[in-house]
Amino acid sequence: KRQWPRVTRLLSQEHQTLPSLPRWDPLHQHTDLLSPLSADNDEVLHTRALAYLLDPVRPHGFDIDLLRRIIRRLRGMPNVRERQLNGILRLLGRTKREREIVVIPEYRHLVKRAKKQTYPRTDIWIEIHAGRSSRLIVIENKIEARESDLQLTSYEALAKEWRKKHPSGRPLLIFLTPDGKKPRSGTAGKWVALPYAELAGMLRRTWLAHKSAPGAEWLRLYLASI
């Protein structure tokens, strides 16, 4: 209840900007992708939608635009190192022939232990390879559910093991939530909290830059769902 005055104020500020936007802007739209399916808050669908948009080999026509916008937007945010972002951007700047980007939604890992095997599942696992250099981005998407006590810690361990096998910089770990709250688990200082409002802004800019792309209408409908 203590949060309602702040939420109301933020919503009021957002609505004041709407009259200055064109009527065709996604922020004005009442028709969206997920609400007809009663799936507005479905974490799996949002995760898969975001993974689709981040994957440059999918036929949406946005290439690496959204991924690059997210990396640039993280500059100056808590738990982010400038060198870390610059390393990722350098690899993204390579030509398509020089680099490989792998985006895997709902990636189930096999972890072998002394007495049992576990199968932790990361929401979005992104590997960027170019020559002898590699980078890793892990996105954990939480809309209504909270992370379990050791969930993020286990993902940190997966990222650490990946780094042992690839010459790379520090893995970029992103915690995506509606309000940008900090995770309650995981190692302090390792996860970057990103709110959906920031993501929506980057999606909108991507849409504005690619309105004639094959996936533009799909992106417009998804953006209206956020």
Identify the function of each model-found stretch.
Residues 1-226:
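Charged, terminal alpha-helix-loop-beta segments
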